[in-house]
Regions:
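Beta-alpha-beta core module
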Residues: 74-80, 85-86, 147-194
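Secondary-structure junction motif
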Residues: 16-22, 65, 105, 109-133, ...
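Flexible hinge/capping segments at coil-to-helix
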Residues: 71-87, 91-113
């Protein structure tokens, strides 16, 4: 009997991991060979282009839509929006700004900005974070989510994301606060044009919607 296969590549979103867990629990197969990759943005696009992953999870904004849309079109990929989010700041619950209802960029100037390294594609177009490092005096780049959240706690640092947070994966001492900017993030999936999605991919998309709506 052939093992069912499914692979997804995503930016460092806890809801993407939770949706992956839901798919495995939903099918509860005797055997399977599934893969989830938290990667740099260009790697996600390459994985889906080369059918290494059936789906990718990324975001588009006014700052990166033009560049990434051209890249997706060139690689015969399509972007399907799942939801729109306003940018939020992730900080620890003991942070000096933790009591504020919303946070401004000026509020953050004295604190380290944690971002995910994008390798040779380290530009704002491929950044996972909505705010450019050029807007911050103190910048630290990391490769994995655990390190990022440890530094947020240890250094009173912050990162900028969609605001969808998982206490189980990120820890209960990480909190989310709205960032006071007039912008938004369109989070969605990328897939190959003309490729019929597997039942696992379809279920994964539904699980993503459930975690993000």
């Amino acid at each position: 009997m052939t093992k069912p296969h499914f692979a997804v590549s995503c930016q460092h979103y806890s809801f993407a991991v939770n949706a992956f867990v839901d798919v495995i629990r939903e099918f509860d197969a005797y055997q399977y060979d599934f893969t989830i990759r938290e990667e740099q943005t260009h790697e996600i696009i390459e994985d889906v282009t080369n059918l290494k992953s059936e789906l990718g999870v990324i975001y588009l904004s006014s700052k990166n839509t033009e560049v990434l849309s051209k890249m997706l079109k060139r690689n015969e990929l399509e972007f399907t929006e799942l939801f729109t989010a306003t940018p939020h700041v992730f900080i620890c619950d003991s942070h000096p700004l933790a009591s504020k209802k919303s946070i401004t960029m000026d509020d953050l100037q004295d604190y380290p900005y944690l971002t995910y390294e994008q390798g040779e594609y380290n530009s704002q177009y491929f950044s996972e974070e909505f705010v450019s490092t050029l807007d911050s005096r103190k910048n630290i780049r990391v490769r994995d989510r655990a390190t990022l959240f440890n530094l947020i706690i240890g250094l009173n640092g912050y990162t900028v994301c969609s605001g969808v947070i998982s206490a189980e994966l990120n820890g209960r001492n990480i909190i989310s606060k709205p960032l006071d900017v007039e912008e938004y993030m369109r989070i969605g999936i990328i897939s190959r044009k003309g490729v019929v999605l597997s039942r696992y991919a379809r279920e994964y998309i539904e699980a993503l919607k459930a975690h993000c709506m």
